Amino acid sequence: MRINPTTSGPGVSALEKKNLGHIAQIIGPVLDVVFPPGKMPNIYNALVVKGRDTVSQQINVTCEVQQLLGNNRVRAVAMSATDGLMRGMEVIDTGAPLSVPVGGATLGRIFNVLGEPVDDLGPVDTQITSPIHRSAPAFIQLDTKLSIFETGIKVVDLLAPYRRGGKIGLFGGAGVGKTVLIMELINNIAKAHGGVSVFGGVGERTREGNDLYMEMKESGVINEENIAESKVALVYGQMNEPPGARMRVGLTALTMAEYFRDVNEQDVLLFIDNIFRFVQAGSEVSALLGRMPSAVGYQPTLSTEMGTLQERITSTKEGSITSIQAVYVPADDLTDPAPATTFAHLDATTVLSRGLAAKGIYPAVDPLDSTSTMLQPQIVGEEHYETAQRVKQTLQRYKELQDIIAILGLDELSEEDRLTVARARKIERFLSQPFFVAEVFTGSPGKYVGLAETIRGFKLILSGELDSLPEQAFYLVGNIDEATAKATNLEMENNLKK
């Protein structure tokens, strides 16, 4: 782990000042810089442009070397706006890649791509920094044991379980509960696994980033009184940033997560919102660097760039990074190269359904569309696998019967189908769950449900033992015992009304 001042800091040491170049050309966020013969910087080195513009405003722009062009000239991509830069300006080669602060001091704080805090809470209290470019862990360091990452969320753990150290795609439109699900996962990993989370906001709306920060403070995921008690570090490179920043902000977040895994030996959750924007930024940079575009205008290095990021997200013998990535599918075309390349890396998909959200069933995870490579009897065990399959079959049959019910009504169904519908409606409601982070809004206390409890509950519903209970008893409860207790309370209330 490198211990040095971050390249983004205002001070660049006297040693680094020896290697000076000057700007020869500026095209948008891309700079060509000329260095003295024999003093060429390496690829990925950070360059710093300092000076004043025409109205004497201070300029401090960090760039990253992308190409060595020959004739002592390099091409670099700026990590912030290039407004005010001029030809002939002095450029300092820092002699190292971009480095960002890591460790416990990053929790509860918001950073930009350079690792600079942007939350007005003062400097970060750490001297430990780490370069954002590093190779993926070697094969010998990897933990190859397949194990489930228990989230405490019934619908996820039963029907589309997450792999420890795996990658999960999160699909869903606006307003179906992505943010609340993300915050609940951050909360549960801290409580159940003693782990921390890193959130990488890649090329999304600034307003959404601000909303997430405010909601995290409200729900206690970020502790304002004692910032060190927070459970998450935030790294933002939003839509208005140059493509260089959006392309590298995912690596900044990943570097912070790697420190928690490798040095603190913790289980880490890494959220990337949105992985498509990472690809999009790479495509913009690729065009600016003059590379020939590939299919649909994407960069020719699309698979390599995606692989470089994704291969660093894994389980090692020290700890694990489990990544949840929001995936935007352009024009709902799953064959588009960006989502298609992402799918190759995913172990599970969690699909959020607007129909379920409209019914008031939260989390609105679609039990039939969500998938996981972990749902195999040899991994999760026969009991879990059988229960999950029977739940899916019951829900699928209910879905097929809905058209008949809408036209002819329930009475026209056979006795067997009516029983299936009744159980499916109970299952649908039992898949809902009160969240800890939503206590503020719902007023009902959150519930963490262990996997064994989840399986027991669904087995009881499928066996028919609970057929006599009303379906509203299963809505927004934790384990099955709470559902039976709720049914007793409902019965008592009904008797009192009579």
From Swiss-Prot:
F-type ATPases have 2 components, CF(1) - the catalytic core - and CF(0) - the membrane proton channel. CF(1) has five subunits: alpha(3), beta(3), gamma(1), delta(1), epsilon(1). CF(0) has four main subunits: a(1), b(1), b'(1) and c(9-12). It catalyses: ATP + H2O + 4 H(+)(in) = ADP + phosphate + 5 H(+)(out). The keyword Acyltransferase does not apply. CDD domains: ATP-synt_F1_beta_C, ATP-synt_F1_beta_N, F1-ATPase_beta_CD. Its EC number is 7.1.2.2. Belongs to the ATPase alpha/beta chains family. It comes from Populus trichocarpa (Western balsam poplar). It holds the Pfam family ATP-synt_VA_C. Produces ATP from ADP in the presence of a proton gradient across the membrane. The catalytic sites are hosted primarily by the beta subunits. This is ATP synthase subunit beta, chloroplastic. It is found in: Plastid, Chloroplast thylakoid membrane. It is a peripheral membrane protein. Keywords: ATP synthesis, ATP-binding, CF(1), Chloroplast, Hydrogen ion transport, Ion transport, Membrane, Nucleotide-binding, Plastid, Thylakoid, Translocase, Transport. The keyword Cell membrane does not apply. One of its GO terms (molecular function) is ATP hydrolysis activity. GO terms for cellular component: chloroplast thylakoid membrane; plant-type vacuole; proton-transporting ATP synthase complex. GO terms for biological process: proton transmembrane transport. ATP binds at residues 172-179.
